A protein has these predicted regions:
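Acidic/histidine-enriched, beta-strand-rich ligand/metal-binding domains
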Residues: 1-69
Length: 69
């Protein structure tokens, strides 16, 4: 999945697979997580003033995830 860089203290890059409904988040520490989220949530993350805060408040502990690296 292609990811693109974002301006964030904790998040390095974000990608989304529309067909699978999977958000991929790469953190500055090198870890990568995938979250099963609807496209609207992905768009909300992109539009958020703080990507980290949006992830914490609207995605983490709400949607299924897996650590892939």
């Amino acid at each position: 999945m292609d990811r693109f860089r974002v301006e964030s203290r904790t998040i390095a890059a974000i990608g989304y697979d529309l067909a699978a409904g999977v958000l991929e988040v790469e953190f500055h520490d090198g870890s990568v997580y995938q979250y099963d989220v609807p496209h609207a949530i992905y768009e909300g993350l992109l539009d958020a003033k703080s990507h980290s805060k949006y992830l914490r408040d609207h995605i983490r502990d709400v949607y299924p995830f897996r650590k892939i690296r």
